[in-house]
Amino acid sequence: MKLKLWLLDLNTELVSGRDAVFLWGVSNDGRRLLLVDDAVENFFFLIPSINPEEVAKKVLLEGKEYGVIKTDVCDKKVLGRPVKTVKVYVDRSENVEKVIGKLGKLKVFEKTYEGDIRLSTRYLLEKGLTPSSWFEAEVEKDGNLPSIQVETFRVKATKPLEEERVPELRVIAVHFLKTCEKGSPKPEYDPIVAVSTYDGKTLRQFRYDGKTDKHLIENFVNQVKTFDPDVIVGYGITEDWSYLAERCKRVDVQLEVGRNYAKPHMSVFGHVSVTGRINIDLLHNARENPQLTEYTLDEYARSIGLDVSPQIPEQKYYEYLSNPSEAEKLFKQSEECSKLIYRIWTVLSDFAIQLSQITGLPMDHVFTASSGHRAEAYLIREAYSIGELIPQRGEKPYVSYTGGLVLQPEKGVYENVSVLDFSSMYPNLMLKYNISPDTYVPSGEKCEDCFVSPESKHRFRKDYRGVYTSMLQKLLASRRAVREALRSVKEDSVEYRVLDARQKALKILANTLYGYAGWVGARWYLREVAESAAEWGRHTIRMAIEKARQMGMKIIYGDTDSLFVIDGEKLEKLISWIESELGMEARVDKRYRRILFTEAKKRYGGLLENGSLEVVGLEVVRGDWAEIAKETQLEVLRIMLETMDINKAVSYVREIISETMKGTVSMEKMVIWKRMTKPPEAYEVRAPHVLAALELSKRGWRIDVGDKVGYVVTRGISKIGERAKPYQLVEKKDIDYEYYVENQIIPAAMRILEVFGVDEQTLMREPRRGLMAFGTD
């Protein structure tokens, strides 16, 4: 019997004492199915130090009692060089590590490879299957297979299929509402207040009944079982599952939400797995956005272009719930959050599916895995296809090297600035100079025809493509083909949406490889590779800068793979020269009407052509400043970039100072927030937020790692740290407004205004009387 299945997820289990791979998916007729393959093989490779045939016999003889069942001698490659290897088959995946340890005592091999490849990954490689893709399977019914929520078959054979269509997936978005009176809610003490779900049609909410959250949890679990979603999506749901699991223990509920009736469990990359379903935590995707500072759901939604109303902050939850007339607003917000999470998923789902198909990672892993792990997943597939052995992870010493070129900006404001983007430079350089661990020629080894890096003189072979460059060649060729296909389809079509998501995923993966090369945790880490790519990158940027200046263009800033250029008329000529003479792609990424640079690198603010502000590195985008300081800086920046009216900006700052000194600014805007990276008592340096956390702990608040602590600075003559008090324990009249003016508002405003020659005294209406001039009349 043949079936066609779209592979949703996979995991491994023991069936009748044997390793088996469980393939969960959606059939072409819309059924949810499980296919079980228990004819899987576990193996790893040895590089023998003596005759390979002798090693194979000795390993089989000595290893039988530990689980070795067969050995073969085969030809493979290590860093592009042919080697004879011994392939060691082991009865169970759980025994591989033990077998390697025991065999080490034989002292007949130099190194092991692929001993830490997960069985599910191995299976996909061996069968040529890819998550989020279609395959055909020859199956049979078997009454000995486990009885679970979906129909189950035993696999006899599989074959990948070339089909782009995505089945209609059942998706449920979930939002958990939790709070407590003192500090962050803890599952040991604090019940869940509400769970809101949205499946694209139906909105549901289950609430705490005032006595226990047992019924709330039972209703939620039953809904998951009844709706049987393929995808569960949340924001911060990794932590929510952990919280929910602890609550289930407290109220005696079985959290059986997997398709095999199993509980959620921690998997790779810090990901929580719900067996048979895709569990998506959008917070992981949000954390990849360098422009976000607070990582709240509404901030994240706005960053991807969604319109969102301001939300009640978490620190206000308990206050709202304690007031019957306000509580309903919070419950309504939870419902809206579930709908917002669903909306975000509809925006990102195509991208997630395409990235899954390209990397070979299940959909719920592509967001939790780091960019390096995603690149490595693709590299593993590429290495397998060319017979290259996959190195095992191991401890490697980190040796620093010089990174990308960052120019010192000239302080000032500039108009009509174009940003020339070289984001595809590093992939193209790695291709051009064949930069890869397996093409690197070690010092002392002969090479008659090599590429030589500009500074360190590292050498790379020209005679064959490396694993990195083979990967890049395929990625860039695929992206060109996809972009060409985009031209022939309508922009409002599903096909366009899918193709666009794919070309973005291909671009991100290609651009990731340069960073991966310098990641010490990489399986194929080689410092010389990363160092050489950086050298050729700096060399390329310097040549572009030199040419631009020869053409009479002004370069005001440069950062790794971008140049900020004035004189747009000559820009197209420069781009043509870069493409023809340097062989690199360059394009105008954005244009600023005006842009302001401070003297520091990586700190600027600009007014884009569409009228929006972009801020990099300034206080307004950093989390350790009070809201009043951030608001002031952002508005001063806006005034100056839009109007260049110094008097208007100074008047605005004076008004803020006056309102602050009069006490009319809300207390919430005075709070300075810091996240705890360790328990309060573990800090050796007692910074203000640590002292505030310790004070809260004394008063019964539960402060843990990851919690945000908010404090305000109060009046007094002692050190600032000693006057930093938890905002919850302070009355507004006790706030030291002079501190906020002198150490928050003025420094934040001056970061912008000093560029225009404004000094601090200019901000004071009556300098001789000092700050008291701004007090109450």
Feature annotation, model-predicted:
Residues 92, 165, 177, 695-777:
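Low-complexity, acidic/Ser/Thr- and charged residue-rich accessory regions of DNA metabolism proteins
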Residues 2-63, 152, 156-231:
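Conserved RNase H-like, two-metal-ion catalytic cores of nucleic-acid enzymes
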Residues 81-167, 359:
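N-terminal accessory regions of nucleic-acid-interacting proteins
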Residues 566-723:
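C-terminal polymerase-core module
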